[in-house]
């Protein structure tokens, strides 16, 4: 099952040329770009490991693509995402975030329903155990 997080997650995986164009869009807007990776893509895990520092003041997406290639070389077995941070007054937040790398074996999650007191229902997202191959 394909993990869907961030922009473009409903589309086929982006090619490097498409990633380059999205990064160039971020830079044209004056956003800082950063690369992050994780082996725990749980929807509530918002704190991914950063690959280096955020890239401020870049003019060309080639620098980001070079760092992405190195991150893929080291952490190609994990999820990698690119984010564009807008520091302008009134925003000061991530404006775009999308996956640029997936591990060979995707993580799977399921929604567990639990009835609790007062006829309330509680839902929890849990990671499914990997399927065993016989």
From Swiss-Prot:
It comes from the Bacteria. Belongs to the RuBisCO small chain family. The keyword Zinc-finger does not apply. The basic functional RuBisCO is composed of a large chain homodimer in a 'head-to-tail' conformation. In form I RuBisCO this homodimer is arranged in a barrel-like tetramer with the small subunits forming a tetrameric 'cap' on each end of the 'barrel'. It holds the Pfam family RuBisCO_small. Gene3D superfamilies: Ribulose bisphosphate carboxylase, small subunit (3.30.190.10). RuBisCO catalyzes two reactions: the carboxylation of D-ribulose 1,5-bisphosphate, the primary event in carbon dioxide fixation, as well as the oxidative fragmentation of the pentose substrate. Both reactions occur simultaneously and in competition at the same active site. Although the small subunit is not catalytic it is essential for maximal activity. This is Ribulose bisphosphate carboxylase small subunit. Heterohexadecamer of 8 large and 8 small subunits. SUPFAM superfamilies: RuBisCO, small subunit. GO terms for molecular function: ribulose-bisphosphate carboxylase activity. Keywords: Calvin cycle, Carbon dioxide fixation.
């Amino acid at each position: 099952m394909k993990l869907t997080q961030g922009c473009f997650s409903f589309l086929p995986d982006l090619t490097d040329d498409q990633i380059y164009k999205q990064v160039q869009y971020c830079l044209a807007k004056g956003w800082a770009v950063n690369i992050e990776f994780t082996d725990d893509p749980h929807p509530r895990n918002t704190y991914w490991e950063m690959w280096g520092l955020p890239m401020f003041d870049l003019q060309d997406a080639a620098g980001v693509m070079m760092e992405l290639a190195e991150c893929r070389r080291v952490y190609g077995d994990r999820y990698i995402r690119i984010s564009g941070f807008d520091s302008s007054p009134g925003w000061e937040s991530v404006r775009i975030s999308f996956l640029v790398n997936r591990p060979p074996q995707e993580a799977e999650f399921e929604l567990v329903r639990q009835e609790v007191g007062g006829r309330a229902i509680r839902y929890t997202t849990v990671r499914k155990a990997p399927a065993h191959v016989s």
